[in-house]
Amino acid sequence: MEREHIFIIGPGRMGVGIALAFALHHFEVNLIDLKARSAEEYERVRKKAEQDVGSTLNFLRRIGRLKNSPEEIGSKISISHDLDKHHFEGSFIFEAIPERPDLKLALLRRISPCLRQDTIIASTTSTIDLKTLKAGLTHPAKLLITHWLNPAFIIPLVEIARTEETDADAVDRMKALLKRIGKVPVVLKDSPGFIIPRIQALAMNEATHLLEEGVATAEDIDTAIKYGLGFRLSVFGLLEFIDMGGLDILYYADEFLYSAFKNEKFKVPKLIEEKMKNGEVGPRTGKGIYDYDGIKVESLFEEKYEKLLKLLSLLEQGGPRS
């Protein structure tokens, strides 16, 4: 299978992380710094990126997660600041510059004349929508958002955001590329915060409110997340867990919390209300958010429990939890 040449614009933490994700799977990567800098400043940025690549690869070798030498993997990543010599002959470009619409639009306008019509360009933004970004390109149908989670070379998930104007082939090619480097892509409509940042922002805000209110210490809040919610969510998706616990549990919990806090964020979602009216509360009724027709519920729970117990064994190998 042909190995596309990967271009990543922006040598910061995300750019380096994405470069490593591809280099670890033997892709040639061009990491490009297009910010206007003096020669001395560019050299400093280049050396910092090289050091970040090298230190990460040495770490992976120390813990036995590197099949090839750090030098061999590191040689897959070239760092430059010369746009003209590339002409982006590669098939994929990842934009990973700071989270400012003006900077991203200026970059897209700058590189647009250099792109082939089949070149796919993906912004790594976690907040800016495609409607804003597409104004910078001559062929916006090839523009996607790929939202990676730090550290990009470890976390499997990559969210792919698209609009109705996005070329379906561009989405399919991006999904295929990401799967080749061991990622788990999910496709969604262009929406503020996508999936993870939107859910994560609410969870982080609520944890901060608990701390502000003196409900628990920072250490105990984090311990509760790591050994409770976070531990469980490594096996259950959120919607899947609603089903497994029973939609009625969430329904009554929301009613109580809404009554206690008088806050709209705890109001029962309309979908949950509809499911309750229809008696669709999860596996025990054959349907909840998911359909369980023909599925043996006991086996489903046992499968999840087995995975949780394997994770528990890994945690116990890590020594004391406090």
Predicted regions and their residues:
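NAD(P)+-binding Rossmann beta1-loop-alpha1 motif at the extreme N-terminus of oxidoreductases
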Residues: 1-56
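Rossmann-fold dinucleotide-binding core
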Residues: 122-190, 194-197
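Rossmann-like NAD(P)-binding element
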Residues: 37-44, 59-120, 128-129
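Structural/interface elements that position substrates and couple domains in central-metabolism enzymes
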Residues: 30, 183-184, 197-200, 204
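NAD(P)-dependent Rossmann-like dehydrogenase/reductase catalytic/cofactor-binding core
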Residues: 2-4, 183, 189-190, 213, ...
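Rossmann-like dinucleotide-binding cores of NAD(P)H-dependent redox enzymes
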Residues: 34-67, 162-167, 194-200
